[in-house]
Design a protein with these regions (language model features):
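Metal- and O2-centered redox machinery and metal/ROS homeostasis
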Residues: 1-171
Length: 171
């Protein structure tokens, strides 16, 4: 499974999960710009915890691995998450909530044995940047923010379409 075949397979395999996630009360409030800012920042903190582990595991998996070329693309989100958290005066190393802790434990297990599962997680997170760009616009108004505080949601700016195409081609 390579290239667009991998992207098509991942899209099909994650479609039901994607629909459920989009219909969750949290996601609906986020998209509508009605999520309280402290809940948004708490979510950023948990994404920081997730990316801390995911980035470490994918970096280890890429050493001599078939995914090394894919992982050469700009997928890391630590810089944006750190900047967003700093904007809101939050710590760079937040503590995980139980659900995040359980998920990052699973990421660590996959890193040791199933790097393809990590690529699936990365596919979902990278794919989410397509819609998160619109969420950033909504939150810009709702929270009276400029770019500061929204870097994680809009990491590529106007290059979003090209970056997503590059990522899928590298799969």
């Amino acid at each position: 499974m390579t290239g667009s075949g991998a992207a098509a397979t991942l899209k099909a395999e994650t479609n039901d999960h994607h629909r459920r996630a989009e219909s969750s009360p949290f996601q609906r409030a986020l998209v509508a710009g009605k999520l309280p800012v402290d809940r948004y920042v708490g979510w950023l903190e948990q994404m920081r915890v997730l990316y801390r582990v995911l980035e470490a595991e994918l970096t280890l998996a890429a050493v001599g691995d078939r995914y090394a070329a894919l992982l050469g693309t700009r997928w890391r989100r630590t810089p944006e998450l750190l900047a967003d958290l700093a904007h809101f005066g939050r710590p760079a190393e937040p503590a995980p909530v139980p659900a995040t802790d359980a998920f990052v434990g699973q990421l660590a297990r996959w890193g040791g044995e199933k790097s393809a599962a990590l690529i699936g997680v990365l596919y979902v997170l990278e794919g989410s940047t397509n819609g998160s760009r619109y969420i950033a616009r909504s939150l810009r108004k709702a929270y009276a923010l400029d770019l500061a505080g929204l870097g994680y949601l809009d990491p590529y700016g106007d290059a979003q379409t090209e970056e997503w195409a590059r990522f899928k081609a590298a799969l």
